């Protein structure tokens, strides 16, 4: 069914909106009560119309990425923003605790994809919880643990959601990766299997005996320099980053995402930079999201690189130094 929906939108011909609406609801397990069904359908149809018009522009060679249906198609961007996005302040005192990354003329490859060598775990889904910062944190921790121990482990986002509040994070209402590092300097991070994700903030259930990894320090790139971020990712493995999300990002399907409206000065969503490359003369970042595999390129987005710090990708980047716990 997913392939059918994608094919319909790719050619830009919907046929029956009724059929597609019901198929979409079944695919994403959407159920509404009474008048809310029509309200959600009205929003859905506006988004579908925008997707069709945008993809026609793509077919004409006017834009470099496509849009598609996903689990968010029945939401306005304002609703989506209120539920999933939180402005991530760069004014926090905690941001001065990291070590600004310096490449020291260390050469990095022209392209790299850390997925190919086992440094990136499967795409995860944060669900109805504003915990992107926790997924960004575990993503970069997973890469560093693999680098040090040659073992791939999926770490617990739920532990960070439940337990790092005293370090400045707000569970499902937002947080900062660097606050999480400060917490992990004192407590070991458990695995996903020992402390599974629930998408709801709960009481801290940390078990010291099950802690696996800790943070001893962290590198930062806060300058907005994509060259510095490339050096960090190319030399040190996947890095936690944050970006400014706007409506087309919410509906992104494939291609190299280029936005004229997102800001390089503010960020509201944490993700993971797992590599970079070039296609058809356009440089891009490979970015892992935490919205499941039905979003984007099976959970990933390629974002234009060397375009003036587009969407602020190099404004709040970090990478922890990881060791075994205790």
UniProtKB/Swiss-Prot annotation:
Strongly inhibited by Antipain, E64 and Leupeptin, and weakly inhibited by iodoacetic acid (IAA) and phenylmethylsulfonyl fluoride (PMSF). Requires the presence of dithiothreitol (DTT) for activity. The lineage of its organism: Eukaryota, Metazoa, Spiralia, Lophotrochozoa, Platyhelminthes. Residues 1-15 form the signal peptide. GO terms for biological process: proteolysis. The gene is Cat-1. The active site is at 132, 269, 289. Residues 16-106 form a propeptide. InterPro entries: Papain-like_cys_pep_sf, Pept_asp_AS, Pept_cys_AS, Pept_his_AS, Peptidase_C1A, Peptidase_C1A_C, Peptidase_C1A_papain-like, Prot_inhib_I29. One of its GO terms (molecular function) is cysteine-type endopeptidase activity. The keyword Protease applies. Thiol protease. Probably involved in interaction with host tissues. Displays a similar activity to that of papain. Has high activity on Z-Phe-Arg-NHMec, but no activity on Z-Arg-NHMec. It is an enzyme of class 3 (hydrolase). Keywords: Disulfide bond, Hydrolase, Hydroxylation, Protease, Secreted, Signal, Thiol protease, Zymogen. It comes from the Eukaryota. It is found in: Secreted. Optimum pH is 7-9 in a mixed-buffer system. In a Tris buffer high levels of activity were detected at very alkaline pHs. Contains cysteine residues involved in intramolecular disulfide bonding. This is Cathepsin L-like proteinase. Monomer. Disulfide bonds join 129-172, 163-204, 262-311. Its EC number is 3.4.22.-. It comes from Fasciola hepatica (Liver fluke). The modification 3-hydroxyproline is found at residues 109, 196. The keyword Disulfide bond applies. Its main location: secreted. Belongs to the peptidase C1 family. One of its GO terms (cellular component) is extracellular region.
